[in-house]
Amino acid sequence: MSIPLLNYSLSTQNQRVDGYEVSPGEEQPRAYNTDNLPSAVEMDEVIWAAYRQIFSEHQILSSTSAPYLESQLRFNQIKVKDFIKGLILSESFRKLNYDVNNNYRFVEICVQRILGRDVYNEREKLAWSIVIASKGLESFINMLIESDEYEENFGDSIVPYQRRRIIAQRSKGEMPFNLKTPRYGADFKEKFGMPQFIWQGPVRQFRPQEQRPKAGDPALFLGMVNDLATV
């Protein structure tokens, strides 16, 4: 008997705010899709957008390319949804993301890149981590891609993207996922012996040589005056 998905509450996120923009600006994400029989150039853009979404820009390598899946997508043998699933389940994605992270962080990465939103809370991380531990990686990916949330927002033909990163009601948008969630977590950085740039002593202020006070400048005597004032 399989363990049911643990219930978790929702939290306030931009993607839960309905948009009523008449003409969205260039800051809004572009939805790449194959609805209108794209040309060869447009199909290249769709494929590139899929790689950029799933592997993020810092993981797009020659080893992550999937020419067989690309060929199937170009000849309409599979849908964009199948292409996304193939990239997620590829060996290269597993090595770059699953093998170097714990289940909680891997859940966060997959929710961001597949569903286009951040995790709601720690309980959602726990719920999906239990799925990975009990049913395996492939079942976890299938549950995300076959979910109602994915179907309502992306369907079979749209490349996932970060939903509603910028809304008119707020002066600042949410941080892009590729900047918010780097490849390694803090625990794996320590495990791999990566340098931690932590200064042990006080950080002194640096002043360029041309801005240093010269002989006769009253600023040279400012420190002495302050010392006298405190006595």
Curated annotation (Swiss-Prot):
Membrane topology reported for the UniProt record: Peripheral membrane protein
PBS-linker domain ranges (all copies): 11-191
Location in the cell: Plastid, Chloroplast; Plastid, Chloroplast thylakoid membrane
Keyword hit for Thylakoid: yes
Organism: Porphyra purpurea
Keywords, alphabetical: Antenna complex, Chloroplast, Membrane, Photosynthesis, Phycobilisome, Plastid, Thylakoid
Family in the record: Belongs to the phycobilisome linker protein family.
The protein's name in its UniProt record: Phycobilisome rod-core linker polypeptide cpcG
A Pfam family this chain is assigned to: PBS_linker_poly
Gene Ontology biological process terms from the UniProt entry: photosynthesis
Subunit structure as annotated in this protein's UniProt entry: The phycobilisome is a hemidiscoidal structure that is composed of two distinct substructures: a core complex and a number of rods radiating from the core.
One GO CC annotation: chloroplast thylakoid membrane
Primary role: Rod-core linker protein required for attachment of phycocyanin to allophycocyanin in cores of phycobilisomes.
Domain of life (superkingdom): Eukaryota
